């Protein structure tokens, strides 16, 4: 009888749905100096495992990831896993002096987190000073085993990560800019997977080549890791189908060109031509420019090569490929905001049964922040002049006119230990203290205030945030990245946001869900998110120059009442300041 009962129970257990448990993945990343040559210029740069860009990391939805980061360089270091929610694991998020003190020379730290409810293309990068110029790599999250993509399985998946190459040391560049108050020097080239390509001098051998077969579909995982530039990207004589943005599936649409801001990722399907075309095709990217400062006005190119038919393979195939006609794509104009707007408007969440768009329909708190540039007075002694907008001012940037001052202690630890006094203020304004015509004639006083201010939210608060660009020192697009959350972009527009009219046009059905949004130049973006993740979460412009100038702030989400709504305790190896 007991045996029959046991068999019956066992049979019932077999009938229950079996959970797809994740596994634990271990990685070790050594941050070390490495000599790298590009554009006939060799320099010693900060690398990951001696590679530039860093190695591809792969996990599946549901996996626990333990990444030991060992610092073997003179610089302090921290790594951010861009787009990972870090549910209750804020200690692993990575921004220096926000969620952790940086890892000092000769020290190590294990980033320990579980990937919950996420799959797609993300990336990792250094999150201190300008070290992410060389410390970055793809972070690919595959769906759970047995869970298909919402599109046909591609023949092959290819990460393509855009970056910027500087002949000079980027730490010296931002250090000089900070001292003089001026704009930093721009990059010498853009790169695809670390390679500038043949349109630059002394660079033909450093070209990314994508070898494809006719009649196949390739999933290109595009990542913009550039420091300071949004990019247009196109493949000559080919269209692509956009299927994902910031690791969220979108309603598929075809396009010849994509726009991708720093911090953003975009997955596209490339269907190759049905037969061998007897040609090769440039894949090019160049900047989308809205600001008034200097920029790197150059173009990176990779080459799409078709595998030749079998009868032409052999010793001469590489030579024959070299002799093929090479087509170039036509990219939008550098300042083509019309294209940027149309592309942005096409992005919609898939909003299917399996991948719903859970937009907060009821909002607990509404915030209105300005984002833009400003000035600080010269801090030089001996009446030395600055190189900012005037010879008595330095460039600055702010959110709601508060230029964020980086603390010397980690904010998350200060909050967790109850020792926040003198480290940060919990009083970030809900809206600008001094309203003005944000996109009209700028005010005479362009000075910012400086402080370490946090916005405090009770657990599970539903938030609506409108971010408004300003015309101070010129309107400009700002890609804003929020750590710890995805958000829904429910509205965008140009001019000043109208709280009475504009919300009527909000998309609350299938808005794009992402972690980095471009606030339009001379316009605004409205986002909604649910503050269901306790911790301190950085929000900043992903143009590194603007972040350095202070266009950043942080949200403090308090613990909830239940045990699974509370921040986990700090790990034993958390770095000390």
Swiss-Prot record:
Record: residues binding Cu cation 4: 478, 541, 546
Pfam families: Cu-oxidase, Cu-oxidase_2, Cu-oxidase_3
UniProt catalytic activity: 4 hydroquinone + O2 = 4 benzosemiquinone + 2 H2O
Signal peptide start and end residues: 1-22
Biological-process GO terms, alphabetical: lignin biosynthetic process; lignin catabolic process; phenylpropanoid metabolic process
The protein's Enzyme Commission number: 1.10.3.2
Domain of life: Eukaryota
Binding residues annotated for Cu cation 3, in chain numbering: 127, 483, 540
Primary enzyme class: oxidoreductase
Free-text cofactor note: Binds 4 Cu cations per monomer.
Cell compartments where the protein resides: Secreted, Extracellular space, Apoplast
Binding residues for Cu cation 2: 82, 125, 542
A single MF term (Gene Ontology): oxidoreductase activity
Glycan attachment positions: 35, 76, 112, 185, 201, 237, 297, 335, 383, 391, 401, 437, 444, 450, 460
GO cellular component assignments: apoplast; plant-type cell wall
Domain Plastocyanin-like: residue ranges: 30-146, 156-309, 427-561
This protein's UniProt keywords: Apoplast, Copper, Glycoprotein, Lignin degradation, Metal-binding, Oxidoreductase, Repeat, Secreted, Signal
Function: Lignin degradation and detoxification of lignin-derived products.
PANTHER family: LACCASE-17, MULTI-COPPER OXIDASE
Family to which the UniProt record says this protein belongs: Belongs to the multicopper oxidase family.
Name of the protein in question: Laccase-17
Species per Swiss-Prot/TrEMBL record: Arabidopsis thaliana
Gene, per the UniProt record: LAC17
